[in-house]
Amino acid sequence: MGLYNQSVNNPIKKFFRNKFIYFFTLIFDKLIFLSHGEYEFAEQKYFNFKNKMYFLPFSTDVDFWNTNKKKNYESPRKQILFIGNDGKRDYDFILKLASEIQDYDFVIITKKIENNIKLPKNVNLLSGKWDDLNISDKDLRTIYEESHLTLIPLLDSLQPSGQSVALQSLSMGTPVIITRTKGFWEPDKFVN
């Protein structure tokens, strides 16, 4: 994911990066892409290796990420959820938004924001990552149930980002606002 993202400005690094990617593409039998944008980019740039490239749509376990609980949109305080740890999330944006919209509660689950910084009073920062045990999937499912909206602000890149959070949230009946990037995994499947 993100291997073909061309964000290197240094000409020497760019030269060696391009050689590495060409060699990588040459030696492997199959290259699987989770982002349709990156898949199309790689197909165009390395068209001689097109037969090795496959787009695999990202999915989620809809049996687990499911709820019958109805959202209470009439509640006086509404909860906005942000989850993520990869380098393409826009952490500055979510913190700025939380400080500007004080009448919403923000639950931010990440290890990328230090808990020693001054946070707005409406922010509940939870340290969590998919591969640690700080927050179980069952706990996360409850947080999705309690949230009125999931925000996934992203920095522009060919690297796909936010698929699991978006699909889990939608499966739980929680609407999602996500940045459309060059690496958006299946842009034709999402509207507005």
Task: List PLM regions with ranges.
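A short, histidine- and acid-enriched strand-loop-helix "catalytic/donor-clamping" loop
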Residues: 1-14, 30
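Short, polar loop motifs at secondary-structure junctions
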Residues: 36-39, 109-116, 179-183
